[in-house]
Amino acid sequence: MVEKRSRQSSSSGSEFSVPPDVDNPPLSIPLKTLSDRYQLIEKLGAGSFGCVTLAKAQFPLSNILGKQHDIRGTLMDQPKNGHQNYITKTQGVVAIKTMMTKLHTLQDYTRVREIKFILAIPANDHLIQIFEVFIDSENYQLHIVMECMEQNLYQMMKHRRRRVFSIPSLKSILSQILAGLKHIHEHNFFHRDLKPENILITPSTQYFEKEYMNQIGYQDNYVIKLADFGLARHVENKNPYTAYVSTRWYRSPEILLRSGYYSKPLDIWAFGCVAVEVTVFRALFPGANEIDQIWKILEVLGTPIKRSDFVNTNHITAPPPGGFWDDASNLVHKLNLKLPYVEGSSLDHLLSSSQLSDLSEVVKKCLRWDPNERATAQELCEMPFFENTVASQVDARGNVTNTEQALIFAGINPVATNTKPIYFNSSTKLPAETESNDIDISNNDHDSHAMCSPTLNQEKLTLVEFLNEFVEEDNDDHSIPDVGTDSTISDSIDETELSKEIRNNLALCQLPDEEVLDHSLSNIRQLTNDIEIINKDEADNMEQLFFDLEIPEKDEFQRKQPFNEHADIDEDIVLPYVNNSNYTHTDRSHHRGDNVLGDASLGDSFNSMPDFTPRNFLIPTLKKSREKFEPHLSNSNQHFGNVTF
């Protein structure tokens, strides 16, 4: 019989079990003492995975950059990046992401999705730099140490208000996002949560030494990095697919309509949504819930079902702006819904300026109903808008079409003879997710911005849910570098729906609450002034279409803090294609997290629907009573989920 050991945490005083394999930690995730290596300055945010803390390294960061023998070919292998983020590296400033849940064994941490991604993806200039990954030897929590960026893209846009990006800056920002996304896709992963909050930005003058910038001739005003790889998935992973990945506003039709399979095209859809939002400082599809999300897409892209399928139409017209999707009719029928006929609006109306005609073509290639019709990241890089940008200069390898990705998923080698398109079809839907609620790790409330399961209707994040969201099974078909990271634990837990982000719960983080009194760190604290802690309030008006471009006054959403002049490199530009007076992203968290799609009856799901949803959107047999949508502000609940590294 194995003796069960326990010890007392020095930070919280509580007892916890010592992992049975404490004497045999994974080679890729060693045991180290957090308090010996880093001084914790302040907590920046928290989410379902854990919390992010600003910290100062108590050793030169150059000691670990690219010098660890077991990290070659991973996101930690960055020996040539000494000039990047020079100021914060010199000061030893880092961001530490701490996993909130403790797993049974140390080897189990190698199954965490973000760890698998870090160990499988080579470093790239447009992905957040990872310094080290380790397990704290005092309380056995997982820590991911990464570079600290100034703010995320949403915060930058909100600070700028009416000052939209100039065309060169816009092109630079989007090309860097696309370059990072292309790098992920080339290595057969897809991000699954691309949104402005997960795109980090720092002015280039604060990121590089001036001498180095002049030496390499760096012209871009900003440095852009993709972050938060907790939902990243390998294309050959055949475990059941989660229905609630991605953030609702950037969620693709195949996810909204429960197609049963998705891959890289969902990132392309999200990129198209982000591209429009970064251009006009207004979310493209700000749905209040999933039904409203589908309706907002219909208003712009039109109905993807051929008009001959509708009773009162008997003449054929041109395809809708978003194209046709043969699977759509079957998918909505299985959800007990029906789509009204909507012609849609030309995508050219979204970006009407002649200066943005090339970008408009990019968006059209991204926002297609049928995932197989969307461009690949490589194809987007080759479009005129990205000519002579970093997106067009990256390595051209890994140019695989979406059809070939589906063939790979089906276990078929994509050779030249396989020319028949493989479609996303709900008839191949994978088995329903396993339901398990045995172990409850905390009494955490959920954020208001994500969907909860209609069948479980839980208010707690269980350990099983956490493992399903962030920890993969061991039977993945893709390989991870052989650095002793394979877990010896095997289970049959299927991947279930993505739970809502829990509120900031510092007790679960179990990080030492150390006060750093060193006055030399005042410049470090200054770095956090630009990282805005955003109130997760509910939006007060969601009834306007994006392309009306008349944004109601929402002063109550604006933070009472000075504008960050250092984050604004461009001149005060107000371009003719935008006339908004304030950028109010109306974050997804400002809305009620009503889940109105799924296996359960939809009858009671529309109680919080706005009045403008058309009546014929619902099958007549369903319950039609709906309460009027009464948005309200909630100042009592402050969340920190938008601060992402």
Curated annotation (Swiss-Prot):
UniProt-annotated binding residues for ATP: 44-52, 67
Name assigned to this protein: Meiosis induction protein kinase IME2/SME1
UniProt keyword Glycoprotein present: no
InterPro entries per record: Kinase-like_dom_sf, MAP_kinase, Prot_kinase_dom, Ser/Thr_kinase_AS
Coiled coil: none
Active-site residues per Swiss-Prot or TrEMBL entry: 193
Catalytic activity: L-seryl-[protein] + ATP = O-phospho-L-seryl-[protein] + ADP + H(+); L-threonyl-[protein] + ATP = O-phospho-L-threonyl-[protein] + ADP + H(+)
Bias type Low complexity, positions: 8-17
Classification via SMART domains: S_TKc (SM00220)
Entry keyword set: ATP-binding, Kinase, Meiosis, Nucleotide-binding, Serine/threonine-protein kinase, Sporulation, Transferase
EC assignment: 2.7.11.1
Family the UniProt entry places it in: Belongs to the protein kinase superfamily. Ser/Thr protein kinase family.
Residue ranges of domain Protein kinase in the record: 38-386
One of the record's GO molecular function terms: protein serine kinase activity
Region (Disordered): 1-24
Any single GO BP term: regulation of meiotic nuclear division
GO cellular component: cytoplasm; nucleus
Species in which this protein is naturally found: Saccharomyces cerevisiae (strain ATCC 204508 / S288c) (Baker's yeast)
Underlying gene: IME2
